[in-house]
UniProtKB/Swiss-Prot annotation:
This is Ribonuclease HII. The gene is rnhB. GO terms for cellular component: cytoplasm; ribonuclease H2 complex. Its EC number is 3.1.26.4. SUPFAM superfamilies: Ribonuclease H-like.
Amino acid sequence: MQIGLDFNLVEDLVAGVDEVGRGPLCGAVVTAAVILDPARPILGLNDSKKLTEARREALFDEICEKALSFCIARAEVEEIDSLNILQATMLAMQRAVEGLHITPKLALIDGNRCPKLAVPAAPVVKGDSQVPAIAAASILAKVTRDREMSAFELIYPGYGIGGHKGYPTPVHLEALARLGPTPIHRRSFAPVRAAWEAREGVTDSLI
């Protein structure tokens, strides 16, 4: 049985903000901002990594139905490569908060840094396992990104993307070395850059 966070901790017009996808070698970094409704409890909210896939999917629908406002945003691979992953994540978080149709009185950001926002903000280390609104944001972001990675499995077969979701597992690294990077791989990340340079070397030697 999975125990969720205490919904009584939910505060009026406080947005929780979280990201998924800083570590993977491919795909966008996805963020979400959520303002929960204290009058509409959602049972079982917790850090998305502590929940089963089926539970995350069920909570995703419930959060979308019951939240006062939510926004799912992203920074694309091209932005990650041009800005760096930290700055791209901050940009995606900024987009998520700006996309809320209700202006929060405070934004609580998972982690130890805050993006530049037009509203007051505070970081909360391990906030996704403490603050219900951040937990809700982590669920929206993770489900969204996982669905995208499963779709990419069909577009770029052979990499196992649907399983590892882009993270640098042995299966992924082996496929990257064997097949080379796809358009969704982050070329600013060392393993991808190494695979790309190796492919370039092979191409040059054949000319």
